[in-house]
Each structure stands twice: as structure tokens, then as C-alpha cells.
Curated annotation (Swiss-Prot):
Signal peptide: 1-24
Lineage: Bacteria, Pseudomonadati, Pseudomonadota, Alphaproteobacteria, Rhodobacterales
Keywords of the record: Cell cycle, Cell division, Periplasm, Signal
Cell division recorded as keyword: yes
Localization per Swiss-Prot or TrEMBL: Periplasm
Protein name per Swiss-Prot or TrEMBL: Tol-Pal system protein TolB
Main location: periplasm
Family: Belongs to the TolB family.
Biological processes per GO annotation: cell division; protein import
Organism: Dinoroseobacter shibae (strain DSM 16493 / NCIMB 14021 / DFL 12)
Keyword Cytoplasm applies: no
Segments passing through the bilayer: none
One Pfam family, short name: TolB_N
Role, per record: Part of the Tol-Pal system, which plays a role in outer membrane invagination during cell division and is important for maintaining outer membrane integrity.
Quaternary structure note: The Tol-Pal system is composed of five core proteins: the inner membrane proteins TolA, TolQ and TolR, the periplasmic protein TolB and the outer membrane protein Pal. They form a network linking the inner and outer membranes and the peptidoglycan layer.
Amino acid sequence: MKRAFLSALSVGLAALFLTGPAQAQGNPGPLRIEITEGVIEPLPIAVPPFLAETPAASQFARDIAQVVADDLEGSGLFRAIPENAFISPITSFDSPVQYADWKAINAQALVTGSVSVASDGRLVVKFRLFDVFSDAPLGKGLQFVASQSSWRRMGHKVADAVYSRITGEGGYFDSRVVFVSETGPKNARQKRLAIMDYDGANVQFLTDSSAIVLAPRFSPTGDRVLYTSYATGRPQITLLDVNSVRSQGLGSAQGGEMSFAPRFSPDGRSVVFSLTNGGNSDIYRRDLSSGAQTRLTATPAIETAPSFSPDGRQIVFESDRSGSQQLYVMSATGGEARRISFGPGRYGTPVWSPRGDLIAFTKQNQGRFHIGVMRTDGSEERLLTSSFLDESPTWSPNGRVIMFTRETSGAGGAPSLYSVDISGRNLRRVPTPGAASDPAWSPLLP
């Protein structure tokens, strides 16, 4: 079954890249990522240091180019050629490209750029992408302007544009991740919300450690975060403004003792969450403007972890109504739910892909935890990871990568954040200042 899946993956990805932008321009040798025996061969790409058009831009030029190279290589789809292999330096942003020199080091793509500091102090970043194989530019050059403090974002934006032009998919580099930062011993950890760039840079703390916080979730616009707070001594849903770092409780849930596992609807106007009353947990939906609350499930089972489909019409959630923890899908207005998980073991924390085609989940089976994906009808289940404890998956904005929490065994085991491609490749640890859990990936930043 694994071989069959890899074969199908090869065909799908090959079709994707062969119909990408390069072929659309009619080039004789389209820029693409080669796939052999179900394994993606990373595309060799050269990203020389960007040119500094003004002296004040010198360090920015080198650093921004490094962010671009790191982003692309970190995706697992590209291999950044080291600078010491370059034959000819880039001396002018507008000078003709010496394609033969880049072919000699087996580069298939080339990114050139320049950085200047405008009179108002802002950075101006220009870049161009070239198909070395076809001796031609790949699309038009682009320019980004932003404050100097946003230099890393400009690198991410360039990388997103390069990624998109070569793969035909949207990028995911100019995004952020909110997570739970943990300190202290395992049996008495202090938890606070933190936010960072997708690659672990620019960490900022959003709450102090006076109350336990869990399960942060971004709004569709990325400027608000829902999370569960124990500030009152019991779990309560709280809404935080990322820019002002101000938070407010959503008030006591109607008819319940505890509310947790919140998530925004795709339009940002309502939230779904679990509400516990008398030991029973059901799924509810609440309008953020009116406060009106609707019960979506009504069974004796424990039902939690709801997640909307991208079109807002359906909700996937976990329930033990069948006797074990499984995944179900129902209308966003409630009603009859259909079970979609039937494999061995227990399933939880389902999250709908932003593409709408897959659902990510946590699975426990035979003493191991896995992050997996399945079609929205439950078919084509694939396990991407396996460890002592993997949980809490969250999708990248383009639906290509999943970030999750991994914890090692033993008394001193601390959770960390990892990411993996939906093919199960490119498992990477995401750097954080300390222990970290419960990641939530933002949409692309505006």
C-alpha cells in the first residue's frame, strides 16, 4: 500500500510541475522538480547574495537572500547551491545572466535581487527568477517595499513568489505560528502563549504564566487568536488581539460548566467549541456578534475538537459515541454525523486542510502516536509520522505542510514542534526558545 501511494504521489506531483508556469510560456525545457521512485529530487537553485544598491543596505542584502535560500531549501522541494560553488558574481541587477556559468554548477533555477534604502528609510527589495535550463527569465521581476524591521518578511515574500512560480502552488513562508510555550518541570509546567515566524524567528510572548493556556487558534484574517484559559480556575474560551495583545473572555458559555477546544468559522463570524455540562461534552456554535449559541450535537458521548471545512459547510470532530475515539463529519448546522475513521486505534484532533481535500488527525495505535491524513470521506488514510507522542496537527496556508507537537518519553521529556510534508517526507524540528506545544499556523500575512 505504501508503494502504491508513493507511485500515485509521483504521478500527481509530476503533473503539477510539468503544467507549471515554465511550460505555460512555451519553453523547450520546462523547469520542474524531478521525481524518481516516488522520491522528490530537490531542484538545485542558486540564490547569490542580493546586491546592495546603497551602503546602508549591505547587510540587509545578504541576510534577505539567506532567508530566501533557507525557506526554499527548508520546503524539501529545493536544494540551495552553496555560495562557494558560484563561478560568476552578480555585479548588476539588470546585467545579462551568464547561463553557462550557472549550468556548470548544475543550477536549474537562479534568483537574483537587489536591496536599497529609500529616502524615507524603508527597504526596497527587487528580485528576478531565471530558468537556467531554458536560458530565460521565469516571469517578470517583482519589487517589495517595507520597513527595515520587516526585512525577514521581505525574504519570505520573495521565497513565496519563487515557490509559487516553480510549483504552481501558493507559498507558505510569509506566515506565523502561535503556540504554547512551556517552562518548568514536567509535573508543574507553566504555560503561556507565544507567536513567531513560521521558521521559529521573532518569538514574542502574548500572555504571562499566571494562568494555564491551551489550544490557540488563529482567525481567518490572522489578527485574532482564540484559546482556552484557566484564569478563572476552569477552562474558558478567550479572544486575543494579536496586534494590541489585549484579551477578553467570551463570557460564560450558556448552560455549561467548562468550554474548550475553540475554533473560528472560515468567515470569522462565529466559533465552534466543546461545552461540558454534567460530565457530558458536546459541540456548540456561537455567534461572536450576538452571542447566540446553538447546540450541534446531543449525545451521551464525549465530543470535542471541532474543525470547519474551508467552505464553512461541514465540521469534523472527534467522538467516542461508537465506544472508542473516532472522527465524524456533520453539517455546520448540526444534525446527523457520519463516521469517517475505521482503522485500528483511536483518532483525535482532526483539522480540515485549507485546500479542502484532506483531514489531518492524531492517531494512537499499539502504543505509538501518529500524525496522519485522510480524504474527507475517510478513504486513503496515510500515516506520516510515528513516535512516543505526536499530536495537535495544524496546516500550512497552502495545505502542503503539517506542523505538530512531538514529546519524547521519560520523566524529563519535553514537547517540541515539528513539521512534515503531506507526503511524509522532510520531517524537521522547528526551533523554539524552550518546550513548545499546540501550534496553530496563520494564513499568509497581508
